[in-house]
Every structure is written in structure tokens, then in C-alpha cells.
Amino acid sequence: MQIEWDLTGEYIDSGGRETLHDALTDALIVLPREHLRQLAAITIEDEDPRGKALGIWRHDHRGVGIALYAGPHVRSLVRLPPEIRLFALRLHFGYTLFHEVGHHVTRFLNKRTAPPRKAAAVEQKIERWADEYAEKRLGKLVAHWQKPGGLAETPAARQALDLALKALRFDTLVTETAESAGTIVPVRSS
């Protein structure tokens, strides 16, 4: 799998291209390698040519791939306080990547779970499955950041992460199980 950067903007307001690179790297760490199998490329571009998407999963003459659009992510976070933008961008970018990988897993790798084409609400089901996949992976990303040496190891960083989760309208659920006591697991609000 290749990672292709096709950006013309500098994205200074969001910390620059390095922040986008770090956001993608963080998200890839918590994705199982088998879920990326047969994916030709992940492309990071400035804008969706149609002007409506944050990212897309595609299966065309170029193979199977994911395109993430940096411009909409950055614009949606400009009004947030600077101290939480780092986490907000990483969460937003990660969620979009996870959602698109969820489409890949559902439509391409695990065809048994894909709904039949004649089902009444096929697209809604596929979108719901991709959202559920993204929510699970986002929880793993947050847990990864909270480990010793992680991005949200300090109390100030955890507070910024909590504020970013709230700013992105993710309700937080603190699980009290033995293996994940104190871990924040985002649950998408309805």
C-alpha cells in the first residue's frame, strides 16, 4: 500500500503538513494490517472535486483506494481554540480514515457481511457499519494516546483531548472494566 500526498496548501492554521502526516501515522498504528490488505493507496488531497466529502473509498481503474481531503478537515476546526486543535484534527482525520477503511472491510474484504444489493436501505446499512467500525477504532486510538509515552499522557493533554472530543460532538463513555479502567471510549451521538 502506498501513501500519496497530493497537497498544494500549507495548512498553517492546523500546524502544517507535519500535523496531517502525524494524524495519518497515528491512525494507521491502530488499524489491523489485514484490514488494509488489497488497498492500493491512501491519497491525501486538498479538496473533494465534488465539494462534499471528507474522504472516499473507491474501487476503480486505479485499484482499491482511499482519498482523504485535508481542506474540509482543517476548515471545520479553524474556530476551535488553538490548544485543542491538535487533538481535534487528529480525531477528525482519524475518524474519516477509519470510516473509509470500514467501507473497505465491509465491501471488499468481508463480502459475507455486505447486505444484498436488493435490500431497501443498503446505503444506510453500509454507512452505519462504517460508522460503527470508525467508532471502535477511534476508541483504540484514544486508548493508544493515553498509554505511557502517548500523546495524551499528561493531565493537561488529557484535558485538551477531552475538550476536543466534546468539540467534535462525541459523547464520552468511561468504561470501568479491569483492562480498560479510565479509558475514554468515544460513542457517536445520535
Task: Show which residues each predicted segment covers.
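Long, charged, glycine-rich C-terminal linkers/tails
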Residues: 40-47
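Post-HEXXH active-site segment of zinc metalloproteases
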Residues: 91, 106-136
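Active-site scaffold of zinc-dependent metalloenzymes
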Residues: 47-91, 107
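Short, flexible/disordered intra-domain loops and linkers
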Residues: 13-14, 77-87, 115-121
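Long, well-structured alpha-helical subdomains associated
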Residues: 2-18, 136-190
